[in-house]
Amino acid sequence: MQGPPRSLRAGLSLDDFIPGHLQSHIGSSSRGTRVPVIRNGGSNTLNFQFHDPAPRTVCNGGYTPRRDASQHPDPAWYQTWPGPGSKPSASTKIPASQHTQNWSATWTKDSKRRDKRWVKYEGIGPVDESGMPIAPRSSVDRPRDWYRRMFQQIHRKMPDLQLDWTFEEPPRDPRHLGAQQRPAHRPGPATSSSGRSWDHSEELPRSTFNYRPGAFSTVLQPSNQVLRRREKVDNVWTEESWNQFLQELETGQRPKKPLVDDPGEKPSQPIEVLLERELAELSAELDKDLRAIETRLPSPKSSPAPRRAPEQRPPAGPASAWSSSYPHAPYLGSARSLSPHKMADGGSPFLGRRDFVYPSSTRDPSASNGGGSPARREEKKRKAARLKFDFQAQSPKELTLQKGDIVYIHKEVDKNWLEGEHHGRLGIFPANYVEVLPADEIPKPIKPPTYQVLEYGEAVAQYTFKGDLEVELSFRKGEHICLIRKVNENWYEGRITGTGRQGIFPASYVQVSREPRLRLCDDGPQLPTSPRLTAAARSARHPSSPSALRSPADPIDLGGQTSPRRTGFSFPTQEPRPQTQNLGTPGPALSHSRGPSHPLDLGTSSPNTSQIHWTPYRAMYQYRPQNEDELELREGDRVDVMQQCDDGWFVGVSRRTQKFGTFPGNYVAPV
């Protein structure tokens, strides 16, 4: 009798020698609970082997072994494709006895067994060429190891490369060389699978968990420091850290403490400080290079700077403070809120700062050393200018200057601002506040004239006067007033007898019994003035003193009558002619008809001379007065300005209405 085939002998197991009545219940349970398990890594094809997941039972004192899948024929299993080393079968459905471990199988939908079970992988399941798991986490037996392998592969270090050739680096500028010089030959201490390696001074990728803001690249670090850092990074992930990390992934809760302590040293200073320090170093190096270039170039010959003509500059629109109150006035500035003295008129002495950007110390190399090379600095110091108006600094970069001061120009910041020096102080100031002196003129400051009171006057108040400004003197009817000086035909300066109150007041409110006598003390040359008009002497005091007084109207020759209301001011004529002043007797009710005027700080006004400057202006926009002491302006009106206050308001006379008053300075432009 011919023996069984060799294939059948190879398929026999211990179950074939157990009686059937002892293994019938085991076979039925194994057929219902078999779970396919993927072995051999699961790459390319899926090779199934079935086993019973339940523990084996003991029969007759021995363990009952599992049955192999080849011993249980099942019509629901079909051949899909042959595994390596096997031959495909010609028939579609084959007996179960012919299944081997190298055959792959699929589960058919028409089968009666439709139990849904997860396919379990042994260990971490199949992996790709790099060792990263490709199976889902829920289908593996050891999810913690799967997590560990996945994390290690994501954050693994790139294999070291080894270069078998040598090369020479081109010579570099010593300023741009790093702290670690690169050798010409790169020996590779560690060889990877590709046979290449790099020097430790090269940049090595590290874990993203160890990233510290502000840390520099490892290219600029010594090799021993890089090696120490690599050792720290490799040793930080302990078993406790892994367990905490995996628990966080499974539960979805945040860790109570950091998983890994930062092995690197913490920066002693914030990143902002480090960046500012680097920027300052780069700026200093750039300034040094530019200064070196300037020393090599020949300095141009100095030429006298032309005189500025502020009258030729086009005026700008009114400030935002008035544009918000009067919709009819055009708004040409920015949306930033500004005080009235910050005007955008390039020709007005009260230059606006809305479009000015203060120059940075790194923009121009000459700003750091005060004017570049010594030759160029001497040339710029020869450009002297005299202040035409008082200028009060609004920021630390600006210079506070008085009228008549001499300032030495260092450079021109832009068309509206200059940088110069005054008594050792360096700062910026408006260009149209100064008058550049010719090169042949000796720069000499002009001191304002001083006055000496020879005899005080006396007056008695006929009406009660309440001053609207700080410089005005309020008094009641019947009080005796000591007259200090006569400001003009309409105003006096005096103080209440027996008190310390002092100020200016209208001449029509008092009965003068004796006029004051003054003497002008000139210690220097007079400021250039217009020859058209003559004016009486007036004193000038600092605005911070208690006697800081400024007149809303400087002395001029008047024609016609005047009243306590400061709107009946006559227009100044071209030639002065003496007129007798005919003062009317105002009623007491006139003292209550004065409305609240706009608060003007006349104590900081610029005219500090015995002669007045009449500057013609033309109204560019319409302005409606809000108080009785303000002028009404219409577009095209001619106005003679005699005083320009630091708050942006002008004091002058309208040729159209023949009235005297105040008005915003950026509504007019010089003619």
From Swiss-Prot:
This protein's GO CC annotations: cell-substrate junction; cytoplasm; cytoskeleton; cytosol; focal adhesion; nucleus
Q: Which SUPFAM superfamilies does its entry note?
A: SH3-domain (SSF50044)
Q: Has the keyword Nucleotidyltransferase been applied to this entry?
A: no
Answer whether the UniProt record assigns the keyword NAD to this protein.
no
Phosphoserine sites (modified residues): S348, S395, S530, S544, S545, S547, S551, S563
Q: Which GO terms describe its biological process?
A: cell adhesion; cell-substrate adhesion; MAPK cascade; negative regulation of transcription by RNA polymerase II; positive regulation of cytoskeleton organization; positive regulation of MAPK cascade; positive regulation of stress fiber assembly
Q: Please give the tissue specificity annotation from the record for this chain.
A: Both isoforms are expressed in different tissues like heart, placenta, brain, skeletal muscle and pancreas. Isoform beta is especially found in liver.
User: What keywords are annotated for this sequence in UniProt?
Assistant: Acetylation, Cell adhesion, Cell junction, Cytoplasm, Cytoskeleton, Nucleus, Phosphoprotein, Repeat, SH3 domain
Which residue ranges have biased composition labelled Low complexity?
535-553
Residue ranges annotated as compositionally biased, kind Polar residues, are 88-108, 359-368, 560-584
Q: How is it modified after translation?
A: Phosphorylated at Ser-530 by MAPK1/ERK2 during cell spreading.
Q: Which domain of life is it from?
A: Eukaryota
Chain segments carrying region Binds to SOS: 612-671
Q: Which residues form the SH3 domain?
A: 380-439, 454-515, 612-671
Q: Where is this region: Binds to vinculin?
A: 380-515
Q: Name one GO molecular function term.
A: structural constituent of cytoskeleton
Subunit-level organization = Interacts with DLG5 through its third SH3 domain. Interacts with vinculin by the first two SH3 domains and the proline rich region of vinculin. Binds to SOS (guanine nucleotide exchange factor of RAS and RAC), through its third SH3 domain. The formation of this complex is down-regulated by phosphorylation of SOS. Interacts with INPPL1/SHIP2, SAFB2, SOCS7 and SRCIN1. Interacts with FASLG. Interacts with MAPK1/ERK2.
What task does this protein carry out?
A: Vinexin alpha isoform promotes up-regulation of actin stress fiber formation. Vinexin beta isoform plays a role in cell spreading and enhances the activation of JNK/SAPK in response to EGF stimulation by using its third SH3 domain.
What is the recorded name of this protein? Answer: Vinexin
Its source organism is Homo sapiens
Q: What is the lineage of its organism?
A: Eukaryota, Metazoa, Chordata, Craniata, Vertebrata
